[in-house]
Amino acid sequence: MDIIGGQHLRQMWDDLADVYGHKTALICESSSGVVNRYSYLELNQEINRTANLFYTLGIRKGDKVALHLDNCPEFIFCWFGLAKIGAIMVPINARLLREESAWILQNSQACLLVTSAQFYPMYQQIQQEDASQLRHICLIDMALPADDGVSSFTQLKNQQPATLCYAPPLSTDDTAEILFTSGTTSRPKGVVITHYNLRFAGYYSAWQCALRDDDVYLTVMPAFHIDCQCTAAMAAFSAGATFVLVEKYSARAFWGQVQKYRATITECIPMMIRTLMVQPPSANDRQHCLREVMFYLNLSEQEKDAFCERFSVRLLTSYGMTETIVGIIGDRPGDKRRWPSIGRAGFCYEAEIRDDHNRPLPAGELGEICIKGVPGKTIFKEYFLNPKATAKVLEADGWLHTGDTGYRDEEGFFYFVDRRCNMIKRGGENVSCVELENIIAAHPKIQDIVVVGIKDSIRDEAIKAFVVLNEGETLSEEEFFRFCEQNMAKFKVPSYLEIRKDLPRNCSGKIIRKNLK
């Protein structure tokens, strides 16, 4: 069944411009407070100009172009401008440093880069020291340096016509993007995403939150991340809604932005919820238009209840990963919600819990969460130039092994326990890091928490807790361990405690456990 009607991204934008015309499509707010607004007609024209810019620089169908940008209008222009001419976007996490960025450039085979002033010196160094296929750099926001192979994105774009000059034949099976995974445990892998994937993601995510053309979807998630692209942007555009892209998340500014733009949908991760909760209470906490808050793992029930009560919102749970493109398990619009369940499989998907021998398990049994979709359509196509890694997680019949541990109940509701790699082996017992973190997070002095396993010559692994305290608080080891002993089984109590100012996180707010020992 062809859910998207054979429509690729070029057709999508031409149709959106015709149907919605002068309706607001995109609002971008920079960290300095500068706001840019574009109607559907204007945004399509900017996308066309950007496509023509790439064509004048020699980019053709199948070429890869890297983007190393914070949230900005140019990211949207480039994303869809490349898609219109059949070229492939390679977004780079804006937090990555030289070695990591160089690795992605080389392994993606990108021949052109679009970036900004703050990142340009790093890429100068990369060009001097590393072998890459990079031929040209476009800068979006600075006077041009006297370097060969560097040009002004804005100047070149403004010289282009608003109608598309190069329109090669496109198929929904064509690759639109190679998105490298966050690599919290290993080298990132390039997730190949097709035009079909993105079109499907728009329809699916719009269905998931019952999105309408009069909605306003605000996100502070980074544009180089799958959540921003597929859960937010593609959903908003596919529904003819307004998409608000904020450059950087600020707990102090967030509710003001929600109120200013009259946002009806937004998305949150646990780090955001915890930092919003430590802001001083305000009489305006409930003065907003939010209908749904899309939420991604993982939060204790106490934290969830406190957040929903204070801000008068409800969380719409969505579970997925880069490889699934969208939240393939989640709460459904209009259905009952069963916290702490992550919901039920969405339409077009099947979900099972499987054992270590790849056999389906009955309700209540703990195992790996596995999802069935259609590669290149409802789930990712493959890992770029990595068939071995693809075969490890994706079966020929479309079953995807998530690497996550969970279980389901008799009614088909699924429950996430932990990443399989985050299960600690302690004296023959399996201990979930997430379970411990949710318990410890309930301590009134603790703002943030992560637990990891460290080598133990007697019990396989010992448990170490890293905590960030609320401002002005102190916490003794005696008080911490007493709290743990009162709230968890003895074999789950951490052996070590380290208090830190912050925890290392990647672009999506996930804690980078490999940096903690």
UniProtKB/Swiss-Prot annotation:
It comes from the Bacteria. Pathway: Amine and polyamine metabolism; carnitine metabolism. It catalyses: 4-(trimethylamino)butanoate + ATP + CoA = 4-(trimethylamino)butanoyl-CoA + AMP + diphosphate; crotonobetaine + ATP + CoA = crotonobetainyl-CoA + AMP + diphosphate; (R)-carnitine + ATP + CoA = (R)-carnitinyl-CoA + AMP + diphosphate. NCBIfam families: PRK08008.1. HAMAP family: CaiC. It is an enzyme of class 6 (ligase). Keywords: Ligase. Pfam families: AMP-binding (PF00501), AMP-binding_C (PF13193). Belongs to the ATP-dependent AMP-binding enzyme family. GO terms for biological process: carnitine metabolic process; fatty acid metabolic process. The lineage of its organism: Bacteria, Pseudomonadati, Pseudomonadota, Gammaproteobacteria, Enterobacterales. CDD domains: FACL_DitJ_like (cd05934). It comes from Escherichia coli O17:K52:H18 (strain UMN026 / ExPEC). SUPFAM superfamilies: Acetyl-CoA synthetase-like. Catalyzes the transfer of CoA to carnitine, generating the initial carnitinyl-CoA needed for the CaiB reaction cycle. Also has activity toward crotonobetaine and gamma-butyrobetaine. Its EC number is 6.2.1.48. This is Crotonobetaine/carnitine--CoA ligase.
